[in-house]
């Protein structure tokens, strides 16, 4: 029997009773989409998945992206699955160790934006019995609704420039060992403009579509006014009332929609506290006629 339990907070729900390693029926897929629209973040506990099963489940919701910036961290034979891990084998990291440690929404820098992330917690570090490496979210439905009416009016119809290199270099400036992007990688991910407000395809409601990780400029404003407005928006969208933290357990699949949330990874574990998470990125091309 499938059971849905709300977190009781602004975001988050748990769906139990679905085996994601089996083909997902249309009825179950529709249930997941409904809960995803209502709650933004969905946890499926006690799963046992291969990388291919993770990709097959994720593909039921849209086209899967293949990451071009971290090709050496792809799952062998399943390039749509990216490995996020601090484990080192034979002197080499098996995955990207410091992914997502600043507030962002995935693929906002892409002409086709992301619809959802699907992550599988194969190995989760614990200390004194407490799971580490939580993922924190903020609701962009709530952020939009909480904006002053005059600012909503002034920003309506405007667009924001998103740049992948902003996030990448921000991580390097904070000590990440990731190398600078190559010219080919930069060409593959050029800056892209997106509407500052989007109509969410699952809810039909407006969301604030900007984030501290990738957003660099409001195109229609002078530079100083753009900087000041973005600084206000970044602070506003991190209002504690809009936020929710999901704590991992081994075997969890965590799925969230990228249009109405921003998120960050909490890196509260050390290099010897091993974490292994496998990720699929579902693109929003299937939903674009409704955005």
Ranges and model annotations:
Residues 2-253, 259-291:
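Non-heme Fe(II) oxygenase catalytic core, chiefly the N-lobe of the double-stranded beta-helix
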